[in-house]
Swiss-Prot record:
Belongs to the CarA family. Coiled coil: none annotated. InterPro entries: Anth_synth/Amidotransfase, CarbamoylP_synth_ssu, CarbamoylP_synth_ssu_N, CarbP_synth_ssu_N_sf, Class_I_gatase-like, CPSase_GATase1, GATASE. PANTHER family: CARBAMOYL-PHOSPHATE SYNTHASE SMALL CHAIN, MULTIFUNCTIONAL TRYPTOPHAN BIOSYNTHESIS PROTEIN-RELATED. It comes from Pectobacterium atrosepticum (strain SCRI 1043 / ATCC BAA-672). GO terms for molecular function: ATP binding; carbamoyl-phosphate synthase (glutamine-hydrolyzing) activity; glutaminase activity. It catalyses: hydrogencarbonate + L-glutamine + 2 ATP + H2O = carbamoyl phosphate + L-glutamate + 2 ADP + phosphate + 2 H(+). This is Carbamoyl phosphate synthase small chain. Keywords: Amino-acid biosynthesis, Arginine biosynthesis, ATP-binding, Glutamine amidotransferase, Ligase, Nucleotide-binding, Pyrimidine biosynthesis. GO terms for biological process: 'de novo' pyrimidine nucleobase biosynthetic process; 'de novo' UMP biosynthetic process; glutamine metabolic process; L-arginine biosynthetic process. Residues 193-380 form the Glutamine amidotransferase type-1 domain.
Length: 382
């Protein structure tokens, strides 16, 4: 039986459609993502915690869903907004339809609305709080009240909410078209020990580090630096994650300690912002944020352009950079800072997602730079 659904933004704009997920209510910051595919990876990206994701590509759900394409143990997005859900999901790897997947994970979603109109509204006014109600006779008054009551992501520390509860080891490399996910590698095949802070880490980041010879110990976001240093890591990885970086004082404090040791540090997304804050820079909330797999970024060191995957609502403020930081990458959309490198330490970071999943792989060599820093560090420590 087809159920109704309603999306109401905090400015009162209403979108009426049909429910394709669970019945109920979802409240969060409404953003749009321009990726043409990879909807399951987007939904399970912890960076989307407390956000309702609008996918601008009109046909979503064509290839169904499967367990291997998940980037975290559960769906992380608060809700989903799409234009059209195909009648049939067709792919040899599909285990269930997108609608079945959403219902099983208790995710509220709406289809059959004008996503072009919604996207243009968000582009002009900026990301807005919103509420989706799915079920019999959704109440617009209730939806508007819920949307207005949502506090927004500014000042919200979500890393400690989405992080792992316990440390764990990760030894699995990347998936290939030839088969299923590979078995975990032997530790003897992985010469570098990297501690990865989980602020909302995506699995493909871990896989790409393993591909480059790293055996990983993934630790909770609030793990003290002293506990990590006892593990004698060759490098420290700072993961992606949701929310505002400024309230994450525990992470900033730990990163400051690591910078004093000379251990190589590599940050992505939220980890990039945290490295900047630990180095004395500032961050700001963006009007729109960057969400999609087609964002051009200029590599200032090599004078080339990369097409990158992006997912962030905060940015490093270039006007407040200390002398110890230099800008390595800039967005060609809005000229915001996309990469930084310490001038005095083996530490660097990137705002986008070089692991893609979904998205292009132009920025994957950043992982290789991390390995180069690790090798230099190990050589100097002998």
């Amino acid at each position: 039986m087809i159920k109704s659904a309603l999306l109401v933004l905090e400015d009162g704009t209403q979108f009426h459609g049909r429910a394709i997920g669970a019945e109920g209510l979802a409240v969060g910051e409404v953003v749009f993502n321009t990726s043409m595919t990879g909807y399951q990876e987007i939904l399970t990206d912890p960076s989307y915690s407390r956000q309702i994701v609008t996918l601008t590509y009109p046909h979503i759900g064509n290839v169904g869903a499967n367990a291997n394409d998940e980037e975290s143990p559960s769906v992380q997005a608060q809700g989903l907004v799409i234009r059209d859900l195909p009648l049939i999901a067709s792919n040899y790897r599909s285990e269930e339809s997108l609608s079945e997947y959403l219902k099983r994970n208790n995710i509220v979603a709406i289809a059959d609305i004008d996503t072009r109109k919604l996207t243009r509204l968000l582009r002009e006014k900026g990301a807005q709080n919103g509420c989706i109600i799915a079920g019999d006779a959704p109440d617009a008054v209730v939806a508007l009240e819920k949307a207005k009551a949502f506090p927004g992501l500014k000042g919200m520390d979500l890393a400690k909410e989405v992080t792992t509860a316990e440390s764990y080891s990760w030894l699995q490399g990347s998936w290939t078209l030839e088969g299923e996910l590979p078995a975990a590698k032997n530790e003897s095949e992985l010469p570098y020990h990297v501690v990865a802070y989980d602020y909302g880490v995506k699995r493909n980041i871990l896989r790409m580090l393993v591909d480059r010879g790293c055996r990983l110990t993934v630790v909770p976001a609030q793990t003290p630096a002293e506990d990590v240093l006892k593990l004698n890591p060759d490098g420290i990885f700072l993961s992606n994650g949701p929310g505002d970086p400024e309230p994450c004082d525990y992470a900033i404090r730990a990163i400051k300690t690591f910078l004093e040791t000379g251990i190589p540090v590599f940050g992505i997304c939220l980890g990039h912002q945290l490295l900047a804050l630990a180095s004395g820079a500032k961050t700001t909330k963006m009007k729109l944020g960057h969400h999609g797999g087609n964002h051009p970024v200029k590599d200032l060191d090599n004078n080339c352009v990369m097409i990158t995957a992006q997912n962030h609502g905060f940015a490093v403020d270039e006007d407040n950079l200390p002398d110890t930081l230099r800008v390595t990458h800039k967005s060609l959309f809005d000229h915001t800072v996309q990469g930084i490198h310490r001038t005095d330490k083996p530490a660097f970071s990137f705002q986008g997602h070089p692991e893609a999943s979904p998205g292009p792989h132009d920025a994957a060599p950043l992982f290789d730079h991390f390995i180069d820093l690790i090798q230099t560090y190990r050589s100097s420590a002998k």
